[in-house]
Amino acid sequence: MLEVVNRSSSDMDIFAVRSGARVRLGLAPSNVTTRFNIQRGQLPGGGTVTFQARPLLGLARAISSEPTILSPGDTVTLQIPPP
């Protein structure tokens, strides 16, 4: 599971990147904590995954997580700071 704590004033598109392939997980609205369930087989390839948050509008900057190895049952938290 990915938990996105969006403290910014911008809605963010959330992506998982693995083996060069980017998969959109969904939208993380501003000032809300959003959870995304990641199903087995949803991300291509193996190894590490990086999560990215990209603003829909505005001046917010894109945020990326550190590369992470996901195992079933893991929860990763992505913090998006206020502007």
Language-model segments: which ranges?
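Asparagine-centered strand-capping/turn motif at beta-strand->loop junctions
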Residues: 4-8
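Short, acidic Ser/Thr/Gly-rich low-complexity loop/linker segments typical of extracellular
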Residues: 21-34
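Exposed aromatic-hydrophobic patches
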Residues: 33-41, 78-79
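Extracellular beta-sheet/turn segments enriched in Thr/Pro/Gly and aliphatic residues
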Residues: 59-83
